[in-house]
Amino acid sequence: MPRDTPQTVPGHSPFWPLFFFTHNNKREARHDLARLSLTLMPILPRLFHRTSRTSSADTQRDARTPPNASPLHGEPGRTPRSRGELGRNLRLRSNAQTSGTPGTPARPQIRASASRTAPSTPQHPQGTEGTRTVPNSPLHNDARVFRERADHTGLSAWRTEMLTRFIEHSRKHGLANDFEQVRVYDRLSRAVDHLKSVLRMSGDSVQLKSLPVPELPDVTFEIAHLKNLETVDCDLHALPATLENLFLLETLSLKGAKNFKALPDAVWRLPALQELKLSETGLKSLPPVGGGSALQRLTIEDSPLEQLPAGFADLDQLASLSLSNTKLEKLSSGIGQLPALKSLSLQDNPKLERLPKSLGQVEELTLIGGRIHALPSASGMSSLQKLTVDNSSLAKLPADFGALGNLAHVSLSNTKLRDLPASIGNLFTLKTLSLQDNPKLGSLPASFGQLSGLQELTLNGNRIHELPSMGGASSLQTLTVDDTALAGLPADFGALRNLAHLSLSNTQLRELPANTGNLHALKTLSLQGNQQLATLPSSLGYLSGLEELTLKNSSVSELPPMGPGSALKTLTVENSPLTSIPADIGIQCERLTQLSLSNTQLRALPSSIGKLSNLKGLTLKNNARLELLSESGVRKLESVRKIDLSGCVRLTGLPSSIGKLPKLRTLDLSGCTGLSMASLPRSLVLPRDGLNVIFPEHLKTDVGNARIQQNPRARLLEGHLERQNEAMNHAMFGDDESVGSMTSVPDNEAGVVSMAFHAKHAYKRLERLRQEAGSSMAAPMRNNDAESMRRALAYAFRSMSDLPTFKKLDNAARSLSYEVQEQLADLVAAPVGQKLVKAIAEGAYGAGRDARAIEQMLPELATRIANHPEIQQLREQAKRYPSSLPPEKLAAKLTPLIQPLWDGTRAVAPMPGQLRQALQDLLVTAEGRQLASEIDRAAHSHRAGDEGKALRGLLPVLAAKIGSDPRVVRVREFVSRHTFGSPQQRAESLAQTLTPVVQELWAQTQAEVAKQGQTPAASPSRQR
């Protein structure tokens, strides 16, 4: 290779994407190339010609590649044949880009690549000639490789200038950072692309974000169709007068431009401008307003604006004005002369203390924060419909406040108001009134009850101790009086016939008026934190529309009887001395879905509770006197999903049916110290699937032990570990004790170490099973047994005389999943089948190697058994002619068919998925299964050491070799095309043919690992 040829990664061409086609057909490849020719034309000469064989001392720019040079020797070769019209076009285009003279073969000038640095990065600012960099990059100004199209927009120059300024500024202030320069260059490039797309009529909006640019490119103000211009966190200093060229601009938004000090006069001459947003800028003033402006929305936020511009009253189309966190000291009286102004928002303007006398046509006024302490008279804001004054110094409302005939919504929160004017009763259009957190407000005027249109009233956090007569507020639907000194309700309170939601919490109420029962529209009643409230009126139980009743932290000891047809859905009584609930609650409150009676003095629940057929949640926590639940009351709760009995320390027993409730998902018994194991129903100790039982701490160990004894997988694992311990003792000490037939005795020290290693992990798994058994969601598998396996075990029990042997078989069979039980049930009738069932169970759930991997493969094993044609034939025969194929005979015939499937599954289980798939065809024959087992032992055995670890790393490579080997591909294609013999015969032929091939590839893999292990650094003998 010539010395000036660029280095490339082996196996990769530097221009590989240009030669990658998805079709093999040459005609389609030429079509692909033709479609790319227009965009790739400038660099095609570099693809068809190589650099010259000149030495490094030669002048590179004078180097030439001889015409028709051989790509290997640089010698003249054969004349390339014509490629048709495309070839002629390529040659013409190539000749046009070269510097050849007439009479001399024109070839493109090729520059040797002196560097392969990352293109266009600040870390490589010194671009040498020939470096592959991005053309015209501001970080590589001297680097040129490809001819670039002329930029008539000036955007590239603007990008270069802005980046240069940024770099100079960073260096000047000691903030130079290459990575930040890269990010800025990337953002500038994306901004340039965005502007170009808008220039191409791809949109009518420009959004620029986080750019350190003091000015926008001139071309921005030449986009005649631009409608929206927005900058966010751009370091703009000014906008040019050419802004007025954007005669279609509708929205102008500048946010985060701290150095933006002046707005050009042209902004008022934009005929289509409707919205102007100036947030977080440095503006202290605005230019004088000219006539003809179409501005409708003006927002100035977080800016040091000191005054509104002259001629502000000329904005005759301005409808919304928002001034937040500015330095305004006063508002121009011209605001009242704005005929279209509907919304005025003044938030957090610390120097603004008063409003102009007239607000004109303003319909919505928002005053949040600030020092405004008074409002204009009603005549100055006669159009007002919505008033919001929050966190303000407002101390008084105007006396004629009631003259605001259009006012519908008022919020006066956290102010210094002491009282309300009497004229407030004249606000007949008022719908919502919120008076929250006004600590100096102690009373309401008598006229307050005349607000006939009022629908929602909120009086929270005030000093109000009584309400005026409310008879006139007939439209009131929501009343909230929380955290007040309210001591009583008016006598005519029951006249609020439309009241639907009432909250009286944390007050000084002692009782509710008897006419509360007349509130027939009432749906929710909240009485929380009323410590002095001891009784409820009996009429309360006859509120047929009441859906939610909440009593918390009160002194109520008894609930009133419920009337027939009650609509109550939620009843909550907490932290109260309640001693009983109505005996007929289950009859009268059939719609009840949530019943919470916590921290009360209840001793028992009425039996009628069992008739609450819609009840979904029952909470009885921290009832220290609750001793029992009635069986008749619990067993009929068919819809209940959660029962909370936590903290019921005197509870000594539970209904036996509680764990059998069909929809129960959670039962909380934590803190029930009076319960014992004897008092727990079996349906809780061994819960059904999906039932979460939270036991008290003192019972968790006993419950776990009881569950572990009923868990077939745990018993299987314990038995397997016991036999392994016997086998290890026999191997180490030569005991004469008999060793279980399912456990082989290790014949050397390595075998004992391996068995001990796997036993250690099995003990950890057993400990996890014990912990899970004591947890709330532990559920034994006794209800997951297949019906066919139950029948098979019953048949085996009658024929087996040895009970311990049957117990082992029972544990093994029932530890399997449902689908595996279905496929193995036929094997239990014969001893040879029983042995296979126990082997499969111990392989998946025992203490052996790869148990977890084998467990995950069991569903696939079940599928293969179900789809095996000979097994299907035998089962069909036994079903049709049971006398000709009894269970013992069927089991004896099925076992040798299922045994190979199990052996193959056990061999490939720990292997990667690709290798498992590659070896599936081999598992039909004994030789193939033996080879798979050999690969498994060599790669995954505990005693394999470093060699096994290396082999495991190469297993995916082995799978790829098997899948791509030409012999394997040909054999599989041949078998798929021909239908000789039966499917079983074809599978056996395929396995017999592929086994030697895979054996050869496996031997090569082993040899490669062995070769790697013979290096001097890895050989202790050589080190010595």
From Swiss-Prot:
**Highest rank taxon of the organism:** Bacteria
User: Which segments carry the region annotation Disordered?
Assistant: 50-139
Q: What is a single cellular component term in the Gene Ontology annotation?
A: extracellular region
Give the compositionally biased regions (Basic and acidic residues): 75-88
Write out the entry's keywords from A to Z.
Leucine-rich repeat, Plasmid, Repeat, Secreted
Alphabetical list of InterPro entries matching this protein: Leu-rich_rpt (IPR001611), Leu-rich_rpt_typical-subtyp (IPR003591), LRR_dom_sf (IPR032675), LRR_domain-containing (IPR050216)
Give me the LRR repeat coordinates as residue ranges.
192-218, 223-246, 248-270, 271-293, 295-315, 316-338, 340-359, 360-381, 382-403, 404-427, 429-450, 451-475, 477-495, 496-519, 521-543, 544-566, 568-589, 590-612, 614-636, 637-661, 662-687, 824-847
What name does UniProt use for this protein?
Protein PopC
Q: Which organism is it from?
A: Ralstonia nicotianae (strain ATCC BAA-1114 / GMI1000)
- Which taxonomic lineage is given here? Bacteria, Pseudomonadati, Pseudomonadota, Betaproteobacteria, Burkholderiales
This protein's gene is called popC
